[in-house]
Structures are given as C-alpha cells and as structure tokens.
UniProtKB/Swiss-Prot annotation:
Keywords: Chaperone, Cytoplasm, Ribosome biogenesis, rRNA processing. This is Ribosome maturation factor RimM. HAMAP family: Ribosome_mat_RimM. It comes from Coxiella burnetii (strain RSA 331 / Henzerling II). GO terms for biological process: ribosomal small subunit biogenesis; rRNA processing. Belongs to the RimM family. Gene3D superfamilies: PRC-barrel domain, RimM. Disulfide bonds: none annotated. GO terms for molecular function: ribosome binding. It comes from the Bacteria. Binds ribosomal protein uS19. The PRC barrel domain binds ribosomal protein uS19. The gene is rimM. Its main location: cytoplasm. The keyword Cytoplasm applies.
C-alpha cells in the first residue's frame, strides 16, 4: 500500500487479558467505527502488513480487539504503539465541502491577510464545533472550525485560509 492509499484510523496500545486481545486508541468518530473494517493495515517494524480483525468491543475510552494470529499477551506486546490504517477507497464519499480530518492534518494555515499561522497538527472535537490545532515554530493556536472562520480549503495546494487575527 502506498502512503497516499491509506488513512491512519488508530493505534494499537497495550495487551489486554491473556488471550492476545489488544487495547486500541481509535482516531475515528464514533470510536468503534474502525470495527467496521475487517482487515487493517498495521505498521509493524516500519512495514505495513495486513491483519484481520477477529473480534472487537467497546471498553471506554478504548476499544479492545482480537487480531488474527495474535493469541497471547507476549505476541500482542510486540504490536504496542503500531499504527492502524485502512485503504482510502474503503472510506465513504463525502459531500462537497466536507473533509476527513486526516486530509487536513499537515495543511498550511494562512489568514485572509496572507500571514502564515502554521500548519494543522491535529483537530479537537468540542461540544459546539471542531477546533484546528495549528502549530508554528513560535506557538500553538486553537482555531474554531466554523463556516465563519474557515474561508477556504484547497487540498491540492495544501492550504487553509482562515478569518483569524495573527495576534490570537
């Protein structure tokens, strides 16, 4: 799988129990969405390898999963902190103007005056709206992801234009 063909959807945490189950930190919303994908790509020892999901259940704030051929805690331990990805084509199509968070991470953020504010490091879900975490060398900014604040997103040019004061 080429880097652009996959989307990171979570991370394997630590072993859970004695039968090879593993805790998972999900990057999806809701967190159990990643259980909808029967085969995961796991980045193990810097190589992507497919692993089949045998079972999974919600154990908040984590998921716990049983993956094929991982049958004991010692084997499960070797997968600690490995990234979980799926093929991009497994994601549903989005409506015009909607974006997957993963596509926004790494984009440059500039305000409407052309001042560079940094790059999108991550997103935070809050009760009222999502928030872009924008990092530069100097600071971190939390910019609301609202129709007023976000003026445009250009995935090809890798840029987000925001209505945001550079001093905030």
């Amino acid at each position: 799988m080429k880097p652009n063909d996959k989307v990171i959807i979570g991370r394997l945490a630590r072993p859970y129990g004695l039968r090879g189950w593993i805790k998972v930190v999900s990057f999806t919303h809701p967190i159990d969405n990643l259980l909808n994908h029967p085969t995961w790509q796991i980045q193990h020892n810097n190589e992507w390898q497919p692993l089949k999901l045998q079972a999974g259940k919600l154990h908040e704030p984590f998921l716990v999963v049983k993956l094929e051929n991982i049958d004991d805690p010692e084997t499960a331990k070797h997968y600690t902190n490995d990234l979980i990805a799926i093929e991009r084509r497994a994601l549903g199509a989005l409506k015009e103007g909607d974006y997957y968070w993963t596509d926004l991470i790494g984009l440059a953020v500039v305000n409407t005056h052309g001042i560079e504010l940094g790059t999108v490091d991550s997103l935070i879900e809050t009760g009222s709206n999502d928030v872009l975490v924008v990092r530069s060398k100097e600071r971190e900014r939390l910019i609301p992801y609202t129709s007023y604040t976000i003026q445009s997103i250009d995935l090809e040019k890798k840029i987000i234009v925001v209505e945001w004061d550079a001093d905030f």
